[in-house]
Amino acid sequence: MQKASVLLFLAWVCFLFYAGIALFTSGFLLTRLELTNHSSCQEPPGPGSLPWGSQGKPGACWMASRFSRVVLVLIDALRFDFAQPQHSHVPREPPVSLPFLGKLSSLQRILEIQPHHARLYRSQVDPPTTTMQRLKALTTGSLPTFIDAGSNFASHAIVEDNLIKQLTSAGRRVVFMGDDTWKDLFPGAFSKAFFFPSFNVRDLDTVDNGILEHLYPTMDSGEWDVLIAHFLGVDHCGHKHGPHHPEMAKKLSQMDQVIQGLVERLENDTLLVVAGDHGMTTNGDHGGDSELEVSAALFLYSPTAVFPSTPPEEPEVIPQVSLVPTLALLLGLPIPFGNIGEVMAELFSGGEDSQPHSSALAQASALHLNAQQVSRFLHTYSAATQDLQAKELHQLQNLFSKASADYQWLLQSPKGAEATLPTVIAELQQFLRGARAMCIESWARFSLVRMAGGTALLAASCFICLLASQWAISPGFPFCPLLLTPVAWGLVGAIAYAGLLGTIELKLDLVLLGAVAAVSSFLPFLWKAWAGWGSKRPLATLFPIPGPVLLLLLFRLAVFFSDSFVVAEARATPFLLGSFILLLVVQLHWEGQLLPPKLLTMPRLGTSATTNPPRHNGAYALRLGIGLLLCTRLAGLFHRCPEETPVCHSSPWLSPLASMVGGRAKNLWYGACVAALVALLAAVRLWLRRYGNLKSPEPPMLFVRWGLPLMALGTAAYWALASGADEAPPRLRVLVSGASMVLPRAVAGLAASGLALLLWKPVTVLVKAGAGAPRTRTVLTPFSGPPTSQADLDYVVPQIYRHMQEEFRGRLERTKSQGPLTVAAYQLGSVYSAAMVTALTLLAFPLLLLHAERISLVFLLLFLQSFLLLHLLAAGIPVTTPGPFTVPWQAVSAWALMATQTFYSTGHQPVFPAIHWHAAFVGFPEGHGSCTWLPALLVGANTFASHLLFAVGCPLLLLWPFLCESQGLRKRQQPPGNEADARVRPEEEEEPLMEMRLRDAPQHFYAALLQLGLKYLFILGIQILACALAASILRRHLMVWKVFAPKFIFEAVGFIVSSVGLLLGIALVMRVDGAVSSWFRQLFLAQQR
């Protein structure tokens, strides 16, 4: 088997998985149909006008306008309880002084002094609670779908009808200042705009101060009809510090001053709207649908009396989209075509002096216009697509017809209006609320055919991994010829499909194209492999997973079908990992494998191999198992609680040091983080020194000696700046900002340079040649010249290695007549593992920078836990047993589980609110401008760091048992005077070959790498398959969008990251292997001169 065949086959299997994921996703996460219809004054939804028509302004279209101007102040993440007085408190929170309570005191004062002029509402937000989706809802009155949450990195212009378009069409002057997301959503729509970068969540003041610089001068100038100010400081403070930090009190107090200043400048024809687009969790995050995230504040105020009654004791709860039709009608504009919100009828009552009958009639008129608009939208939408339930739609149309008939009768018979008005209002409200509920339920559209096809393709990919992992170690299995057939058929299928679409003039669907190519390549491979190989073997051998491992894997997969277990996966994963560890220990003891590997060298013809005495007993494996369980338990201390478990308390160690208030505690934690960093660096250097690779003069080891300390120093310096940036003197802030940009980039640049050096010179050995060596001596025996074929090279390389060991070992015993040594080489036995450990360390440093400082302790535990598991695995694998090399299923499963456990221990959860957005600004404190791929890459690297590290390090599962061959060696002692006999039987005194044993059988080595990669892909693949099945079966489950859909997305992205990392890790081993061959070839040529 060739090296290229291994990588190509694994890449092909990954492509099968990618095609299955893409096909399933295209059927599961569909967006709703966006209609391009627009409302206009020339096409009213139906007749109707307010009875107080003389109060309106001339030029109104559907309804006479009530206000000529509106000031809309959006305070991002203004949670409802932020507007509460000091005596209130959050449920399940102790009634203590909270930083966010009572800071918006001007709202309560206005409500008490002018109760008919103001109202405070609890705005109910529709998830997902990300900013861009909320802005779409606040301007269109429609609902975003789940998949739209992924668009929060890159905003796109709104094509649906919206308030901003209606305002500009009516000739109103719209002035905007604040969040630059509006620039992409409404390009060219504002008469004047002041945009500020919004994505830097560490910056609390730039956007807010920029708004304040222009807000009051713009108001005083009068050159506006609608003024929009979108403040971001509260949201950024939540992301950076959380709502319970003193900085939150400062930001809310600043917003309170802004509201007071606006109230003082308002004229009688102006309405002030203060709204939060969403709330935030107790950690300051948002994006999900928890109560704290979907509960936002909405405050309305006018210098003239608007409300006929005083505010209720408990603020009314209204859907957020209700603000859209309300503002449209109050300004005399058409309601946007796709709106499904319900007007806030109280605002159409006519004020405190109006009569109850006229107030109720005005409310009914506004509601009827609103209902006509929603009915028109439902009729148009149902004609364009079949999303809406026909039965429910028919019932709603009947309800609207009855309510509309009652309303028309009401206008024609004013004498009986008082008794009928409440009924008409109730019927119209029932219709509007029913229409909204139906749309929410129906817009979860699925393509069952694509979902089934994607699931089948994922299952087939898992099946290929399982079968091929067994075939890989079978001698003579023709992987390379078999791979050419499916690749050719895949290309033929893709070309035929593209040609068919071109013939019938249909748009090319890349997802379907990839699926056709995957199926076209999969079926021929399975047919040819089974016909030529699989049918000759017993069926039981094709499913090699041991019973206990299979049982634990089934438990693992069953978790994905329960929302409760998915939520509790952070606690279930350490339990399963501990079960695998105990299974390894018990199995080693039960099978009597707690011995050293049989340190045998390749016997010469006519000799027999020898066996060494035992190296370890059961206590050794038990100590390793206890150490692993202890690391697992310690890593579990760094946990983030899901929002569904309110009794849980997240670890305070996940927050950055900058959020800590006490200076002494911050310094102590900073010292602990630096100590963990130094410990990690020292452990890697000691390990490399232990096996001698650190003494190599090659560039990678020189970099480890000098470059790694520089990277650690840069990381520690960046942590110091980040933790104290807010406390820096004003004259040093420019310097601190510059250093915060330079240091992370320098660390990343050093890491990239180290990896480049490792790829260039991956063989880290030390070669010493003696001066004046006899030219007649040669190390090539029994060959007389350099190897002429790969077979010759594979045969003589182990002999060369043994000969150099023999010469080095016996140099003190040689006499001068024997002449000096020809050559001595060190560290060949750990050449593969040294490259892998160096690469993992270089990867870990930039990934560590993307996390909070105290996560460095988790990274230290990650390396320690991996080290213990590898040693436990090495304790029971006899590397010289005749036959192919293999890694047991329980070890591969435990390795994959450790990646999942570390994902949770680094403060992540498979939900959007738990994403660490701050990672996007590590090294880019000023933001990224219009670039979106780089922040997405940084956030992705932060989220899936554990997946990447464990996938790249997966080949260590194969290499480590050979590396540990040198431990506990007990060389047989020869009696004095027995040197001649020792020279006759040198194999009895030889040092262990360690990883050079892999070069004794290169075909077995490559087959073992392929099998390991297939096993790892199978473990990851069945997880994504289980998530897809759970999402399919439970697609109408109450928690599908809250639990199952996010879990599928995170597992899918995690699989892609892990598969790429696995290919990179195996490619690095292949690169080292090729470099070792080149090194030996050059040595052979040098010996012949």
Curated annotation (Swiss-Prot):
The reported effect of residue 1047 to E is: In HPMRS2; decrease in mannose-ethanolamine phosphotransferase activity; increased protein expression
Tell me a GO biological process for this protein: GPI anchor biosynthetic process
EC number(s) reported in the record: 2.-.-.-
Q: What does this protein do?
A: Catalytic subunit of the ethanolamine phosphate transferase 3 complex that transfers an ethanolamine phosphate (EtNP) from a phosphatidylethanolamine (PE) to the 6-OH position of the third alpha-1,2-linked mannose of an alpha-D-Man-(1->2)-alpha-D-Man-(1->6)-2-PEtn-alpha-D-Man-(1->4)-alpha-D-GlcN-(1->6)-(1-radyl,2-acyl-sn-glycero-3-phospho)-2-acyl-inositol (also termed H6) intermediate to generate a 6-PEtn-alpha-D-Man-(1->2)-alpha-D-Man-(1->6)-2-PEtn-alpha-D-Man-(1->4)-alpha-D-GlcN-(1->6)-(1-radyl,2-acyl-sn-glycero-3-phospho)-2-acyl-inositol (also termed H7) and participates in the tenth step of the glycosylphosphatidylinositol-anchor biosynthesis.
Its recorded name reads GPI ethanolamine phosphate transferase 3, catalytic subunit
Q: Which residues form the signal peptide?
A: none
Task: List where in the cell it is found.
Answer: Endoplasmic reticulum membrane
Named from the GO MF annotations, one term is:
mannose-ethanolamine phosphotransferase activity
Which illness does the annotation name?
Answer: Hyperphosphatasia with impaired intellectual development syndrome 2: An autosomal recessive form of intellectual disability characterized by facial dysmorphism, brachytelephalangy, and persistent elevated serum alkaline phosphatase (hyperphosphatasia). Some patients may have additional features, such as cardiac septal defects or seizures.
GO CC, one annotated term: endoplasmic reticulum membrane
Q: In which pathway does it act?
A: Glycolipid biosynthesis; glycosylphosphatidylinositol-anchor biosynthesis
Q: How does it assemble?
A: Part of the ethanolamine phosphate transferase 3 complex composed by PIGO and PIGF. PIGF is required to stabilize PIGO.
Name the UniProt key words of this record, in alphabetical order: Disease variant, Endoplasmic reticulum, Glycoprotein, GPI-anchor biosynthesis, Intellectual disability, Membrane, Transferase, Transmembrane, Transmembrane helix
Against Pfam families, the record matches this protein to: Phosphodiest
* Result after altering residue 255 to I: Found in patients with severe infantile epileptic encephalopathy; uncertain significance
What happens on changing residue 370 to S? In HPMRS2; decrease in mannose-ethanolamine phosphotransferase activity; decreased protein expression
